[in-house]
Amino acid sequence: MLFHRILPQYKTAISTYLTPTHCRLYIANLVTSRRMTNIEAAKKLAAYRAVDENLPPHAKVIGIGSGSTVVYVAERIGQLPNKDDFVCISTGFQSKQLIIDNGLKLGQIEQHPSIDIAFDGADEVDPQLNLIKGGGACLFQEKLVASASDKLIIVADFRKQSKHLGQNWRQGVPIEVVPIAFTKLINDLKRLGAKSVDLRQGGKAKAGPVITDNNNFILDADFGIIEDPKSLHLQLKQLVGVVDTGLFTGITEKVYFGEESGEVTTWDGVVTGSTTEEVIAESK
């Protein structure tokens, strides 16, 4: 029934060459494709709104993070008529390329330690605007830029929303570590309650572990549901060999989500105890 409704003009031709199983697979792929198109459109809208509503008119230094939604942030900033009036600070290789590709001026944080505003993505966000970041192995530079910024704005899609950190993001908390300390740190993290700790590997693109832009390793530590992200971050930072963690707490001002429906949801911090559903309802 769905097949005949969606593709009436192709019904005879496709039915001639495809079995019922192939038809169902074709329709499933078509629906998935349309869903992803809606998500991408919403991500773009969220990014554009984030820039339009938050970028100071006389900003001189802007931080640009990484992630699939931040691509649209850089695109929007690159459309500004005054883009020659400011410099952009990257958080890693990907964001550096985004800055260059969109005709923006690239600056260095060593020369511009005070940043007017930063835009970045996230792997998971809870209603208190705590974040898990570091899926792209840029967490230290992302946190450095965020901490130097007067305002941090996060853009992401709805799949990054979560009632608690660790609920939807199952890969663990990314932790950047000094290479010589990684073996000891695996044991230390397990003693702190990590269910598992993995040294992140380069996969097909690289034999061996991922090397960050700072020549460090990434450990992914699964602590399950994280009830107190700030406390966990502070405990992890006390371990010798830890450079920084992917837990970002008390630093985000607002989050823009592209929804599956094509709409944009914004979170700007709520009273502790509110549920994700309540936050979404309040923000629409």
Swiss-Prot record:
SUPFAM superfamilies registered for this protein in UniProt: D-ribose-5-phosphate isomerase (RpiA), lid domain, NagB/RpiA/CoA transferase-like
GO annotation terms (biological process): D-ribose metabolic process; pentose-phosphate shunt, non-oxidative branch; pyridoxine biosynthetic process
Subcellular location as annotated: Cytoplasm
InterPro entries referenced in this protein's UniProt entry, alphabetically: NagB/RpiA_transferase-like, Ribose5P_isomerase_type_A
The UniProt record lists the keyword Isomerase: yes
Lineage top rank: taxon: Eukaryota
EC numbers, comma separated: 5.3.1.6
Pathway in which this enzyme or protein is active: Carbohydrate degradation; pentose phosphate pathway; D-ribose 5-phosphate from D-ribulose 5-phosphate (non-oxidative stage): step 1/1
One GO term describing the cellular component: cytoplasm
Recorded GO MF terms: ribose-5-phosphate isomerase activity
Key words, A-Z: Cytoplasm, Isomerase
Family, per entry: Belongs to the ribose 5-phosphate isomerase family.
Record protein name field: Ribose-5-phosphate isomerase
Lineage of source species: Eukaryota, Fungi, Dikarya, Ascomycota, Saccharomycotina
